Design a protein with these regions (language model features):
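Catalytic cores of nucleotide-sugar-dependent glycosyltransferases that transfer UDP/GDP/TDP-activated
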Residues: 1-384
Length: 384
């Protein structure tokens, strides 16, 4: 079996997660483990999974090893020191880099095939020409790939001259599985939503939300690109239509200051933290709708995950959201913004049969890597 190495500065299992990149790395690694002998090299964040691993080993000074869910993890205390050692030790046939593109130049021995994935265009500023070092470059959705090619800047010029494509991310549906009751208060499915009512009751008790409210959930970095301005304009519309906004996240000072002034009387509870995947799942299981009115969105992992829990997305169709969201499973935000979408949500919430049908459609939509990993396997094999 050929060897595939992921190089990343983010991994949930490695305990160094800051964004959706961490989830993508771990879930894609798990998904292709039947096709390749997979190794993940990442910073050692003393993650709970690593601490629980019975076979955690000290490989060398500052490098620990563990095997989790069929994938070998090398955890580096001093990132990225030690990467050369791991590459020499494992000798991968394919290296897939999710971290800084220039890391490839630090390797004493270049693997036969090297792939790079762009998650955020802003991260590439000043690094554009390093992409030419790779055999193939991908980004996290087909729609975002088109946006990058149409930017009219140095990045779009380089991408137009190299082997570049968009591959829409999937999620690990074996973990985000309400029918198994993993990380939720009760099991439920698209055929039986009784457990979701239990999860909502638990959420309301935990956060002191009146049980009769339609719960809008938003979990994100508090930045303009996530559509937070539009959400703040709609706060009182949400309240007056019988809703309650639970917003979890932290970010720019201007937004934190605005949220700090809002109270439960405004129908808002702001939780100033970024939840881990384990903490996010009970929120999705208990909430009715998930707000994702992004101005710019490379992929949109959270709306996909929300669908798994019957938490209906309220979303724009910007960036990667075009690849994943539509009217069947989401309330689409149009020119009238979140305020206009809230009116649609209130009407939907007032008709239980229609609400249940849309929730079921959400949960039944296939966002798994099973339908998407084939494109990555083509890239790894050099078929494209």
């Amino acid at each position: 079996m050929k060897k595939l190495m992921f190089v990343t500065d983010e991994s949930i299992l490695g305990g160094c997660a800051r964004s959706g990149v961490a989830e993508v790395v771990d879930s894609l690694a798990n998904s292709v483990a039947a096709d390749y002998a997979v190794t993940v090299v990442c910073p050692d964040g003393n993650g709970v999974w690593a601490r629980m691993a019975a076979n955690l080993q000290q490989v060398s000074d500052g490098v620990r090893f563990c095997r989790l869910f069929g994938v070998d993890y090398y955890l580096l205390r001093r990132w990225p020191d030690g990467l050369n050692m791991v590459v020499e030790h494992t000798k991968p046939d394919v290296l897939h880099n999710f971290a800084a593109p220039e890391l490839l130049t630090t390797l004493a021995t270049r693997p036969p095939r090297c792939i790079y994935t762009i998650d955020q265009a802003d991260f590439m500023q000043g690094r554009e020409d390093t992409l030419r070092l790779y055999d193939a470059v991908t980004t996290v959705s087909k729609a975002y790939a088109i946006e990058l090619l149409e930017r009219g800047d140095q990045l779009s010029q380089v991408l137009g001259e190299i082997n570049f494509r968009g591959i829409t991310n999937g999620i690990l549906t074996s973990v985000f599985a309400p029918e198994k009751g993993l990380m939720t208060s009760a099991k439920y499915s698209a055929d039986d939503f009784s457990g979701k009512a239990v999860c909502k009751e638990r959420l309301c008790r935990t956060y002191g939300i009146p049980a009769d409210k339609c719960i809008y959930l938003m979990m994100c970095r508090l930045v303009r690109d996530k559509g937070i301005d539009d959400v703040l304009k709609a706060v009182h519309m949400i309240r007056d239509s019988g809703g309650f906004l639970l917003l979890v996240g932290k970010g720019e000072k201007q937004y934190e200051e605005q949220l700090a002034k809002l109270t439960r009387d405004d129908g808002v509870l702001w939780v100033n933290r970024w939840p881990s995947a384990v903490q996010a799942v009970p929120l999705l299981a208990g909430a009715d709708f998930y707000l994702s009115p992004s101005v710019a969105e490379p992929c949109g992992l959270m709306p996909m995950t929300a669908c798994r829990y019957g938490c209906i997305p309220i979303t724009t169709l910007n960036g990667g959201l075009q690849d994943n969201m539509d009217d069947e499973i989401a309330v689409i935000v149009h020119e009238d913004g979140v305020t206009g979408a809230v009116a649609k949500v209130a009407a939907l919430y007032a008709h239980p049969d229609a609400l249940i049908a849309k929730r079921a459609a959400c949960m039944e939509r296939d966002f798994s890597w099973a339908t998407r990993k084939a494109e990555y396997l083509e890239v790894y094999r050099g078929a494209v």
